[in-house]
Structure formats: structure tokens, C-alpha cells
Amino acid sequence: MKHLKRNIAIVCGGDSSEHDVSLRSAQGLYSFFDTERYNVYIVDIKGQDWHVELPGGITARIDRNDFSFVEDGKAKLFDYAYITIHGTPGENGLLQGYFDLIGLPYSTSGVLVEAMTFDKFVLNQYLRGYGVSVADSLLIRQGYEELVSDDEIEQRIGMPCFVKPAADGSSFGVSKVKNKDQLAPAIRKAMLESPEIMVEQFLEGTEISIGVYKTHDKSVVLPATEVVTANEFFDYDAKYNGQVQEITPARLSEDVTRRVREITSHIYDILHCNGIIRIDYIISKEGKISMLEVNTTPGMTPTSFIPQQVRAAGLEMKDVLTDIVENQF
């Protein structure tokens, strides 16, 4: 008897500044999935508008009671959700909690992991306890800005430094601050994106990004990508408007490559991650490896880091996605 195809929802959109980027990731994923094996649909969610795209340019409303929809007069349920939302609610645990409630398997880590990795300050403090090197930082909450003076920031963190939203899925609201006069406007800018912001030590070195995924029977750490930008830092403009050179595999020594791969696998296990994640690092001239960020819903356009790294590893995105989906069954 022929096995029925699983119905896969590529869940995209979301309520963050990166809504449109998420739609591009969804199109990339749609092109990568094995459609001989799966029925693949794109589900766009924004606020209260949840809908699935159907052939012929029509859409159908998603019933949030069970994440079903009606096609050709028949109710259809999904077997699996591949989440590619950058920011809320797909990268901070909210959507994961909903899928847990209705019993739908999904591609990302669970609620706790998503919530923790979304809050950069919390993540840094947690991983520091496991011996992972991270930049020094301090937290400022909206309404309590006066509790931390500019002089204290300069003394504790130093200049230059970064001011960024503590909980946000993008590079929006991030500023590189070179002197105390730039702190107040940078803090205001970051607080437009998040009520909690972090002031983070500037680390000089080579920036790299590396993907990893694990299943019941394999552990795959992908080749790293080196990020070279003419901008002050790897901001939104550099990330999405081509203001960056991406070198895969990164130009690293054998020793640094080995250590980065070991740390990446270790962080995946510490956090109890699921699916494919991407971790960003700064590597100093002396070879010190400092973790910058853990991205649990990495971009999936054909030119994004993960597809680049999969190609560099001699793998096919189709097979990687099949590994990730089937690991839940």
C-alpha cells in the first residue's frame, strides 16, 4: 500500500520587523522540500490573520483551534510545522507553546529554549555558567534608564560598545557606540524594538556563523561562513542588502575550526536544541572564540548562510530537511 504524503506547513510571517524576510525564507524552503515525499504549504501568520496559500493564488483561513484549513470543501490537518519566522511569535517560544498544546510536531527547539535564546542577555548569562566565552554586557530596562549612568557603562563595558534590543529576532535597533554622547540616542533607538536593551562589549576579530543539526542517528556541524562587511558591523543593511562578503568555508586554521565545531556541538547539547540552528562567533587574533548569538530559525533563502553551508558540505537541502522532519516521527 502506498504511504500517504505528510502535510507540511512552512509557517512564516510573524509580527516582527523581519516579516518580509521570513516570507523569503518560506519561498526558499518551499523550493528545497522534497515534494515527491511531502505535500508542502506556506502558512503566513500576522496578528490575527492566519492563512494558507493554495494553488491558483487563493488563500484559506487557518482554524486556530487545530491549525486546520478547508480545501475543496474538505478539512485538512497538518502533520508537521516547519517554523521560519524571524522574531515573535516563532522565535521566542509563543508559537511553540501553541503547537505543543494542539500536539503538532515542529522543526524548532521547545518553548524554554526558544524563549532563552531569543533573550540575548539571558542566553549570555546562562552559557557563561557552562564556560562558554561571551562578551561582557549589562541590561537596561525601559523606565529605569537613570539607574545606569553613562560613566558606569564606559567603566564596566568600555568604548566602543554595542547597544541592542535584548529580545529581538533581527539586527533592527542595533547601534555601535563610539563615545558617551552616542549612548542616549542608541538606547532610545533600541527601545523602539524591545523594552529591555543590552549594552555589550565590542569584541574585535573575525566574525563567523556556523550551522548545526542533530537527529537520533547523526550529528552534522556544517562548514562555517566568514562574514566580511564594509559596514560598522553586520547590521540589517549588510545582512539583506548585499553589503557583505560571505566566505564559505571560513578562512580559519585547523585548530580554530576544530574548536569552533566542538563548541557549536556543545552549545546545541547544553541548550537541548532541536532542528537546525546557527551560532555566530567572534574569533580574536589570539584565537579566542566568543559566542555572539544563537539563531534558532535561521534564514533559508537560497543565498542565506545555512543553504550556503549545506552546499559547501556536499549535502542537499532536500535531504537535510527530510532528516529534520522525519526525526520527529
Where are these regions (language model features)?
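Hydrophobic beta-strand scaffold residues
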Residues: 40, 105-106, 134, 161, ...
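Phosphate-binding site of ATP-dependent enzymes
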Residues: 178-262, 283-290
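Glycine-rich phosphate/pyrophosphate-binding beta-alpha loops
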Residues: 87, 227-230, 295-309
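Conserved metal-phosphate-binding beta-hairpin within the catalytic cores
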Residues: 201, 268-300, 310
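ATP-binding N-terminal substructure of ATP-dependent carboxylate-amine bond-forming enzymes
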Residues: 1-107, 111-112, 116-118, 122, ...
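Active-site nucleotide/adenylate-binding loops and adjacent lid/helix of ATP-dependent enzymes
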Residues: 2-12, 16, 24, 116-205, ...
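Peripheral (often C-terminal) accessory segments that flank ATP-dependent C-N-forming ligase machineries
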Residues: 151, 250, 270, 276, ...
